A protein has these predicted regions:
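Conserved alpha/beta-hydrolase "acid-adjacent" motif
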Residues: 377-384, 407
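Short beta-strand element of the alpha/beta-hydrolase
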Residues: 216-224
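Conserved alpha/beta-hydrolase
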Residues: 232-254
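Alpha/beta-hydrolase active-site loop
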Residues: 258-279
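Hydrolase active-site cap/lid region
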Residues: 300-351, 361, 382, 386, ...
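Short beta-strand/loop motif that positions the catalytic acidic residue
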Residues: 364-366, 371-373
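An N-terminal hydrophobic leader/cap segment in hydrolases
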Residues: 149-199
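Catalytic histidine-centered segment of alpha/beta-hydrolase-like enzymes
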Residues: 403-416
Length: 430
């Protein structure tokens, strides 16, 4: 006797088959990778940073989506060992991406935009990494007990080597291009200021503070409002006008963040143009002081424009492979490898090419420069001396105490004597 399936049972059976398929290793991996692709699309195309058109992320976002979708498609066709290894690496990377977005949840203004899909990356990455671990463990059951455990030890050692030297550099590249916006702090400049804004050549609106000059000279202090205000307050106390502003992707300014300072020279060029447009600023008496990434950006801006009449660069180091290859001896090996991967990753995540080498740029600066290397500095900061040697114009070098950007706190009187004296000579002619 034949039976006829009830019509309502067919959708239920289909749903059961779908759930069963998704519950497999391949199904779960594809769900996790799909969440990753969703966040990439959201981050790059649906909800980019303020002032940034989606087309600016086209090829970088396309590469990321293609890699995730390609892995999801090829996943069941890969050998178990390769499948598990890739799942662990990509899963860890997704956790890092999600953790960066989760930082927004600790802010007063809470998450917004692509932070929500970014937060989903944490459980999705954990799921994918867990799948990878289980897959590798199951794939190594053949052979003798000694051989099985030897394989597992070899895999563990391989992970210990490849994670810090392959995966983490790419994770760092993601972090430096997706850093959270710093709060705008309370101004402590020792004088009244104006809230100002200006536009870069690529259409971004930047915001900052301006203290008018009392002695006829003006200095741009960087890394802007989020950075140490002590050098700016020192100059204000000496009568200098000072401009501090949020660079692209930070504070109240438009644009994508980039902790390595790529494209930052455009921000300084816009700041100079703004100062030159003000009737209370003498265009022949504009200087700049930059710390860390700000010091690197000052060197590039000084090389690419004659509008800076004097520049102080403190703590300049490495911002891409183009600087790392100039390290000496054995110190060149690890930084060159790591920064090679960081540079490659940043190029993709920022959809941008690395800026010119600071060695080459330093040789093009024609205006006076004071190079400060506060020892012991961070990795790559020893290149400050090479930047100084490459410079062909009027230059000074101060091997200060205090560590990275710590010269002011370590030697405040000497800092004042050197910085104020440098600007007095080159901006005021005294």
């Amino acid at each position: 006797m034949s039976t006829v399936a009830h019509p309502s049972s067919e959708p239920r059976a289909a749903a059961t088959r779908v759930v069963a398929a998704l519950a497999t290793e391949t199904g779960l991996a594809r769900i996790a990778l799909g969440i990753g692709a969703l966040h990439v699309v959201d981050d790059n195309f649906l909800q980019p940073e303020p002032g940034v058109p989606a087309r600016d992320h086209f090829w970088g976002g396309l590469v990321q989506v293609a890699l995730l979708v390609g892995l999801a498609w090829a996943y069941p066709q890969l050998r178990a060992g390769l499948r598990g290894t890739l799942a662990i690496y990509v899963g860890i990377f997704m956790i890092v991406m999600g953790a960066g977005e989760a930082g927004y949840y600790t802010r007063e203004d809470g998450p917004s935009g692509d932070d929500y899909t970014g937060l989903l990356m944490i459980p999705a990455g954990a799921l994918l990494a867990g799948i990878g671990v289980v897959t590798l463990w199951r794939s190594r059951k053949g052979g003798s007990v000694v051989r099985r455990y030897a394989r597992r030890v070899a895999l563990a050692l391989a992970f210990l080597v490849t994670l810090p030297f392959v995966v983490f550099p790419f994770a760092e590249a993601y972090v430096v291009t997706h850093s959270g916006r710093a709060y705008v702090p309370t101004p402590q400049l020792g004088a009244p200021h104006e809230n100002v804004s200006f536009t870069t050549s690529d259409g971004l609106r930047l915001h900052g503070w301006f203290v008018p000059s009392k002695n006829g000279a003006t200095v741009i202090s960087f890394p802007g409002r989020k950075g140490p205000q002590k050098p700016a307050r020192l100059l204000v106390g000496e009568g200098y006008g000072v401009l501090l502003f949020d660079r692209r992707g930070e504070g109240e300014s438009d644009g994508d963040p980039n902790a390595l300072g790529w494209r930052g020279a455009r921000d300084l060029e816009a700041a100079i143009a703004y100062l030159r447009s003000r009737p209370d600023v003498n265009p022949d008496r504009i200087g700049g002081v930059g710390l860390s990434v700000g010091g690197e950006m000052m060197l590039q801006a000084a090389a690419e424009t004659d509008d800076f009449k004097a520049v102080v660069s403190e703590g300049a180091g490495i911002r891409s492979l183009r600087e790392a290859i100039h390290m000496d001896g054995i110190e060149k090996v690890a930084p060159s490898w790591l920064f090679g991967l960081v540079t490659a990753g940043t190029t993709v995540f920022a959809s941008d090419l690395p800026p010119p080498s600071l060695i080459d740029l330093s040789s093009e600066i024609t205006e006076p420069v004071l190079f400060i290397h506060a020892t012991p500095g961070q990795g790559g900061e020893t290149l400050t001396e090479k930047y100084y040697e490459a410079a062909t114009g009027q230059k000074e070098y101060w091997p200060a105490p205090g560590g990275h950007t710590g010269a002011f706190d370590a030697a405040p009187r000497e800092y004042e004597r050197r910085i104020v004296g440098f600007f007095d000579r080159n901006l005021l002619g005294s």
